């Protein structure tokens, strides 16, 4: 019997299963094309995509294996790597750069070769924030630049980061496809029905693909397991944050207590020195008794 206990109507795209269900299958590649084109804002238009192997090995056995969420190339042979960063990672920028080396290195050719490369795009959908300077700046596009002229030095390596927690627009505030896609990614698993603002054909297909009730038993079981892994991961992150805060608070209390004691002792020493000084005791003797410097005693 197919027993289904999940109450959500739509899949959570932050789960491994959910993300690959929506963006990692040939059947739904038009969803990925629409999403990528919304990110590029017309600077380039992707017409078609070919999915590539998401598992990559380094050039030696010592290299770490890299497994991408989605890896594909467009009709021009340009490589596009899409990663869903589900939890905060201290070195996610380093990870992005490391991942970018794989689609670059695999373009190498034996024999005579002029080293001309196809463009590489690394897209990171982040379920955390890394730029605390601005709450409104959530779409980062990073390229290699000349630090003096601020001009783009190399335009065929692009990193796009989306800080999803910063995107808080409501349905009635959505202005374009980019914002609509971010709204879907941010809210899909919480929605009970398709929002009126999302009437484009691509979203019709997305909501049909995302509906949990239409999953086969095998899909449902895979999603349930993926959701458990995601929730365990989130709980681990939250527990670590709480523990860190508690340790910081405890350390702060200890440090505050230490500072308070030191201030109290200093105050007593100054009162004693002031009293001895008033009685005409020599400065060097007061310094020896109180632990204060002669300069401090002279200033009393």
Language model features with spans:
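Elongated, amphipathic alpha-helical interaction scaffolds
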Residues: 1-300
């Amino acid at each position: 019997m197919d027993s289904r206990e999940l109450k959500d109507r739509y899949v959570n795209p932050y789960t491994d299963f959910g993300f690959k269900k929506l963006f990692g299958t040939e059947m739904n590649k038009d969803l990925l094309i629409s999403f990528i084109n919304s990110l590029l804002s017309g600077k380039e238009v992707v017409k078609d995509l070919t999915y590539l192997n998401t598992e990559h090995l380094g050039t030696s056995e010592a290299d770490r294996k890299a497994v991408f969420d989605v890896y594909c190339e467009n009709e021009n042979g340009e490589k596009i790597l899409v990663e869903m960063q589900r939890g905060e990672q201290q070195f996610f920028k380093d990870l992005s750069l490391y991942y970018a080396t794989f689609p670059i290195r695999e373009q190498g050719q034996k024999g005579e070769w002029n080293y001309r490369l196809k463009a590489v795009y690394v897209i990171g959908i982040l379920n955390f924030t890394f730029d605390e300077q601005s709450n409104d700046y959530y779409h980062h596009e990073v390229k290699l630049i000349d630090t003096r002229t601020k001009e783009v030095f190399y335009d065929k390596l692009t990193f796009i980061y989306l800080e999803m927690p910063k995107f808080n627009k409501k349905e009635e505030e959505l202005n374009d496809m980019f914002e609509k896609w971010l709204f879907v990614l941010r809210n899909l698993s919480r929605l009970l029905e398709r929002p009126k603002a999302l009437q484009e054909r691509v979203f019709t297909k997305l909501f049909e693909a995302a509906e949990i009730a239409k999953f086969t038993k095998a899909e449902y079981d895979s999603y349930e397991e993926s959701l458990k892994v995601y929730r365990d991961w989130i709980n681990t992150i939250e527990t670590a944050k709480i523990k860190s805060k508690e340790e910081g608070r405890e350390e702060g209390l200890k440090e505050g207590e230490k500072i308070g004691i030191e201030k109290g002792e200093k105050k007593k020493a100054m009162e004693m020195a002031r009293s001895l000084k008033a009685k005409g005791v020599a400065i060097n003797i007061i310094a020896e008794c109180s632990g204060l410097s002669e300069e401090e005693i002279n200033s009393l």
